[in-house]
Amino acid sequence: MRGALGAQQAPASPAVLVAPGDTTLRGSRIAADSVQYSLVAYRGAQQQTIGTAIDVVRLEMRGDVPVIHRVLTVSPGRAPLIDSTVTDARTLAPRRHRNVSPSRLITLEFNGRRVKGSIGPVDVPSLPIDTTLAIAPFDSGNWDLIVRSLPLEKGYAARFRVYDTDSGLREYRIDVTGSATVLGEEAHVVIFTLAPKRESVVWIGKESRRLLQVETMIDANTMLRQERQVR
């Protein structure tokens, strides 16, 4: 099956650099929600459902700070991955991140440029993390919250830097290439670039700002589609 990645080309337009607290970010664009996605792999004419993802977003107050509390549960088999994050709704700056899988436990605390926490197997003492970065990052696990909070329109391009436990400080880029109707909703079509030759096509609802669908080529012949399930 030929996905949208084969038809979309990210233009080489200048991209603005966005950081936590940027005035163009609007955390109010993110609504409380509970969503289930199907994860389907396409290889040629064959397709296989490989799992589901349940994404729960709550808008809460932590003291006098409004936050976005997100819990993402990915179930590719019997042992799910559970990813929990807390993000400042005013600035989209990350505050906390906890990731639990059968093989690894990650805990992170963000405070501007400083990141502290631990990483390691679930059944042995973990390795400490304590680093001060060149700039205050976003959380790589919440890339879509950042994108959904931006002023998306055709021709818009942005870069933003994230912290990733495996590779440290990284830069992501988005290019809005147009619009399409997905799941009965008008959506922005966004090219999301993680690294050279690593791209996904993302569909984000124009009015709802929901993440509707993501397509990623995971090898030369296989596409992974994450698609929102309509209830």
List PLM regions with ranges:
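Acidic, serine/threonine-rich low-complexity disordered tracts
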Residues: 10-113, 155-231
